[in-house]
UniProtKB/Swiss-Prot annotation:
The gene is rlmH. Specifically methylates the pseudouridine at position 1915 (m3Psi1915) in 23S rRNA. This is Ribosomal RNA large subunit methyltransferase H. S-adenosyl-L-methionine binds at residues 72, 103, 122-127. Its EC number is 2.1.1.177.
């Protein structure tokens, strides 16, 4: 199983890249964790946000292919680390790749939300999207460590 973090935005600060890659390199070879960046639509004073969201959504779903779509969205279901570890086991048993979708400044397109088999809420707070990349990578790594009795996670 491969986990793909599909996120809108390509020009992230260095700390985001460093933070994400710190966790990405820790994943085992049989469960690679990769980042796919979708270019953000051009936003401006007269931008057609609905059209931009639609284009970003199509690109995200295209990048996912046949993988299981899991959106990161405030109205999604919050998971504890133990619950995320159980989700990870369930996803592995499902046999498909996992696509974790992070939208752009206006969130996810209706098409992405409709395609989602699950929706995960990291927090009721609105978080900066660059930070979410790092938090998701760490959270999924921690869940993996729990499922394999790796010493990273401590109660």
């Amino acid at each position: 199983m491969k986990i793909q973090l599909i996120a809108v935005g390509t020009k992230m600060p260095d700390w985001v890249k460093v933070g994400f890659e710190e966790y990405q390199r820790r994943f085992p070879k049989d469960m690679p964790f990769e980042l796919i960046e979708i270019p953000a639509g051009k936003r401006g004073k007269n931008a057609d946000i609905k059209r931009i969201l639609e284009q970003e959504g199509k690109a995200m779903l295209s990048a996912c292919g046949r993988g299981k779509v899991v959106t990161l969205d405030i109205p999604g279901k919050p998971w504890t680390t133990d619950q995320l570890a159980r989700q990870l086991e369930s996803w592995k048993n499902d046999g498909r790749d996992i696509c974790l979708l992070i939208g752009g400044p206006e969130g996810l397109s209706p098409e992405c939300k409709a395609a989602a088999e699950q929706s995960w809420s990291l927090s009721p707070l609105t978080l900066p999207h660059p930070l979410v990349r790092v938090v998701v990578a760490e959270s999924v790594y921690r869940a993996w460590s729990l499922t394999t009795n790796h010493p990273y996670h401590r109660e």
